[in-house]
Structures are given as C-alpha cells and as structure tokens.
Amino acid sequence: MKTYIFKHSLLGVILGLSILGCTEGDKFDYNKNMAFITGTETTPVTKFVVEDTPSSYAVTASTTDKVDKDVNVKFAIDRSLVETYNNEHNTKYYAIPEGAVTLEDADAVIQAGKAFSTPATVKVISTEDFAEGRVYVVPVTMVEVDGLEILKPSKTIFLQISRVIHFTSLNISNTN
C-alpha cells in the first residue's frame, strides 16, 4: 500500500512540475513576417548543375506570410562568405573565380499579396578557370529587404557547381 501511494504521489509531483514548467511559454513571435531565400529551409547548400555555359539558376526570396505592400529585395554575390561557411561547417568549398559568374536582376520585388519574389538569375558564363578536383560554390545573399527582417540562417544560399563531364568509353558488355 505504501508503494502504491508513493508511486502515485511521485507521478502527481512529476505531472505538476511538467505543467508548471510550460507556463512561461516561449518568446518566439509566431506572427512576425520574415524574409529568407527560397530553398534554404533545410540546408543552405544547393546543387547547381552546369552542363554547358552559360547556365542559369533562379534565386528567389520568400516570406513567412503574404506581404501587404510591395517589398524590394536586393541580392548580391559575396565570395567572402565561402571562407566563413568553411570555417563554421568544416568544409572545403572554393569561391567561384572572378568573371565566371554574373548576377542578373539583383533587385527583386515581392508583390503585395504574395509570399515570393521575382527571380534574380545567377548565370555561370565560363568554367575555363575551374581547377580539377575543386568544389566551387556561388554564395548568393540577401543584402537588403525593405520593411522586413531577414531570417539569419536562411539569408544566403550556396549554389554548389556540379559539372557534367562527357567522355567516351569502351563497351565490353557486348558478347557478339
């Protein structure tokens, strides 16, 4: 009988403490509208397949809710972010060489009533200066968003260049 009372008393105390522990609530503002780069919700690194040059990749900004008025978004390529990313994540990416990439339509707009922007276009125009064996990335970041706060972990997308290599090989599977 004593163990029955002890077990139920202990269970009651644990239940009471767990309820009291949740009364503070979290400090996160669920109604706050923030901007982020589309596709960075799970990882900031995204593959960008470059088969021939020029190759294009559309980068857009999204918001956590629809906007009431037009919001201007400014994108930029910031090569210095590659070293920062490498240090934080223990990776060995290389910034794409100067002159190998351009950013078109860097000034995008999230139109009123929508939650995504017009695209900025990243265009790889040359792979001539690429060294064999290196993994290159293009760090595209949101520099400025009018009237909205930028979600820091999703501020930059790293476009990992994946090159398609064509080669011929001997087919030894034919037994004729």
What are these regions (language model features)?
Residues 18-21:
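C-terminal motif of bacterial Sec signal peptides marking the signal peptidase cleavage site
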Residues 23-104, 108-111, 115-119, 129-139, ...:
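Acidic/polar, low-complexity intrinsically disordered N-terminal segments immediately downstream
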Residues 126:
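Residues on the solvent-exposed faces and adjacent turns
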